[in-house]
Curated annotation (Swiss-Prot):
UniProt entry keywords in alphabetical sequence: Ribonucleoprotein, Ribosomal protein
A Gene Ontology biological process term: translation
GO MF annotations in UniProt: mRNA binding; structural constituent of ribosome
Pfam families listed in its UniProt record: Ribosomal_L12, Ribosomal_L12_N
Matches recorded under PANTHER family: 39S RIBOSOMAL PROTEIN L12 (PTHR45987), LARGE RIBOSOMAL SUBUNIT PROTEIN BL12M (PTHR45987:SF4)
Family per similarity comment: Belongs to the bacterial ribosomal protein bL12 family.
Record's protein name: Large ribosomal subunit protein bL12
GO cellular component annotations of the record: cytosolic large ribosomal subunit
Subunit structure: Homodimer. Part of the ribosomal stalk of the 50S ribosomal subunit. Forms a multimeric L10(L12)X complex, where L10 forms an elongated spine to which 2 to 4 L12 dimers bind in a sequential fashion. Binds GTP-bound translation factors.
UniProt organism field: Shewanella loihica (strain ATCC BAA-1088 / PV-4)
Cited InterPro entries: Ribosomal_bL12 (IPR000206), Ribosomal_bL12_C (IPR013823), Ribosomal_bL12_C/ClpS-like (IPR014719), Ribosomal_bL12_oligo (IPR008932), Ribosomal_bL12_oligo_N_sf (IPR036235)
Length: 122
């Protein structure tokens, strides 16, 4: 039995964010690769690329001491359900939002930090 690319894409589209994160982690473990390593290619022009960066990723490194407040902030910022937001908070470090503007990233970072999370903008 063979699964087509279209079937895989349809299955991915039906998954929640947390299910996709878990799938990526399972793929990294099974194939011995890291999805983050592919993003970090730059070489000698990395400094110039950083100056021109227009899209940013907000990464929560820890939920801190007030996990409930962080889960509420995650739900508000991402539109996730309670279970998915709780799973995201507990699986830190995790990308909360990717490919957003600098202003949006800074606002999200401030919101999550006020709730008690430790956050980085990459």
């Amino acid at each position: 039995m063979s699964i087509t690319k279209d079937q895989i894409l349809e299955a991915l589209a039906a998954m929640s964010v947390m299910e996709v994160v878990e799938l990526i982690e399972a793929m990294e473990e099974k194939f011995g690769v890291s999805a983050a390593a592919a993003v970090v290619s730059g070489g000698a022009d990395a400094g110039a690329a950083a100056e021109e960066k227009t899209e940013f990723d907000v990464v929560m490194t820890s939920h801190g001491d007030n996990k409930v407040a962080v889960i509420k902030a995650l739900r508000g910022a991402t539109g996730l359900g309670l279970k998915e937001a709780k799973g995201m908070a507990e699986s830190a470090p995790v990308a909360v939002k990717e490919g957003i503007s600098k202003e949006e990233a800074e606002a999200l970072k401030k919101e999550l930090e006020e709730a008690g999370a430790q956050v980085e903008i990459k």
